[in-house]
Amino acid sequence: MTSDIFFDPIWDVRMTDTSLRDGSHHKRHQFTKDEVGAIVAALDTAGVPVIEVTHGDGLGGSSFNYGFSKTPEQELIKLAAETAKEAKIAFLMLPGVGTKEDIKEAQNNGGSICRIATHCTEADVSIQHFGLARELGLETVGFLMMSHTIPPEKLAQQARIMADAGCQCVYVVDSAGALVLEGVRDRVAALVAELGDDAQVGFHGHENLGLGVANSVEAVRAGAKQIDGSCRRFGAGAGNAPVEALIGVFDKIGVKTGIDFFDIADAAEEVVAPAMPAECLLDRNALIMGYSGVYSSFLKHAIRQSERYGVPAHQLLHRAGQRKLIGGQEDQLIDIALEIKREMESDAAGRQSHAIGGSPRKG
C-alpha cells in the first residue's frame, strides 16, 4: 500500500510543512490569500515536497468554537494548488468537524493528500473517511493525536486500525509537545514493527519542551519516513519543529530530504516571519502545556479566557492538563476559569476578613 505514496527515491524522509495549517492556530486563522500565495511559492522553491493548508482544526474548523477563518479554507487550498509547481498540497480533517463532502471539495480544489486526525484512542472513527479518501484516489495520512497519553503498544494497535482502513502513513502526533526523546523513539519503533510494509510511520512534534528537532531526529532513527515541521516554528503552542533547523540538522547527519537549506532559511526569514503576528515563544504558558500534557491549540483559547475572567493563563493550562482535556474540549476552559476566579475571590475575601479582625490580643 506504500508503493503509490509520493516519495522520491532520493529522499530518506519526506518533509511536510504545516505553517499554513498548524500556524493558523497562532494566527487565529486570519491568513490572507497574499500571505498563503507567498508562503507556498517560497516553500515550493526551497523544495518542500508537501505543504499542508487548512483551518488549524482542519476542514470545517471555521466556527464559533474553534475560531472563524478570515479567508475560506477551500479558497486557500485552491490558491496553494495553483501556486505550487512541484509541491503537493495536503489538507487536514477531523471526523466530526469536517465531513466527507469537505474532503471531496478539497480534492476538487487541488488537494491531493488527505490527513485524517483522531484522538489516539479513537482510530475507529476514521475508518469510513480513509475508505472514501482511497476511493477518490487521494494519498492518505493518519494522525494519532496526543500520542503521549497511551503506551507504545496500545498506540501501535490504533495505528493498525488506521492502516487496515486504508491509511498509507500513520503519524505519532505529539500534540502537547510532551514526549521526551525515548518516548518518541519507543512509539515510532512500535508502529514500525506493527505496520511493516503496510504503511509508513511519521512524526509531528511541538516545541513546548524545546525538543521538536531532537524528537524528530529520534523518530527518523527509529524508522519514521515522514516528518512534519513549520517554518519559523509557526504553529500552536511554542510552535512546531522549525523546518529550517530540521533541514540543517538532517543535512549534517546525512538524512536526505531534497530541501535546500539556504532556500528554506530564506523562506523562513523573509516570507514566513512577516506573516506571523508574533514569534512562537517557549514561554511559561508553552512550558506548562508541554509539562502538563496540554493540547497545543489550547494556548490562544486559554489566553482569551484568562483576559475575559481575569485569571492566570498558566493556571488554566495546568488544570486542563490535570483533567486530561483533549482537542474539541476547549470550551471547558471557561468552566476552569470560573472555578479559579471563585477560588481567587474566596482567598481575597478571607484575607480581607483576617485583616479587619486582626490578631486576637493576649490577656
Curated annotation (Swiss-Prot):
Its recorded reaction(s) are: (S)-4-hydroxy-2-oxopentanoate = acetaldehyde + pyruvate
Query: According to its UniProt record, which residues of this chain constitute the active site?
Result: 25 (proton acceptor)
Q: Where in this chain does the record put each Pyruvate carboxyltransferase domain? A: 13-265
| Gene Ontology terms describing biological process | catabolic process; L-leucine biosynthetic process
Spell out the residues of the site Transition state stabilizer.
21
Give the Pfam families listed for this entry.
DmpG_comm, HMGL-like
Name the residues that bind substrate: 21-22, 175, 204, 295
**What are its E.C. numbers?**
4.1.3.39
Q: Which residues cross the membrane?
A: none
Which molecular-function annotations from GO does this UniProt entry contain?
A: 2-isopropylmalate synthase activity; 4-hydroxy-2-oxovalerate aldolase activity; manganese ion binding
Mind listing the UniProt keywords for this protein, alphabetically? Answer: Aromatic hydrocarbons catabolism, Lyase, Manganese, Metal-binding
Instruction: Specify which residues bind Mn(2+) according to the UniProt entry for this protein.
Output: 22, 204, 206
Q: Which domain of life is it from?
A: Bacteria
Q: Which NCBIfam families match?
A: 4OH_2_O_val_ald (TIGR03217), PRK08195.1 (NF006049)
Q: Which family does it belong to?
A: Belongs to the 4-hydroxy-2-oxovalerate aldolase family.
Q: What PANTHER family does its record include?
A: 2-ISOPROPYLMALATE SYNTHASE 1, CHLOROPLASTIC-RELATED, HOMOCITRATE SYNTHASE-RELATED
Q: What is this protein called?
A: 4-hydroxy-2-oxovalerate aldolase 1
The organism encoding this protein is Mycobacterium sp. (strain JLS)
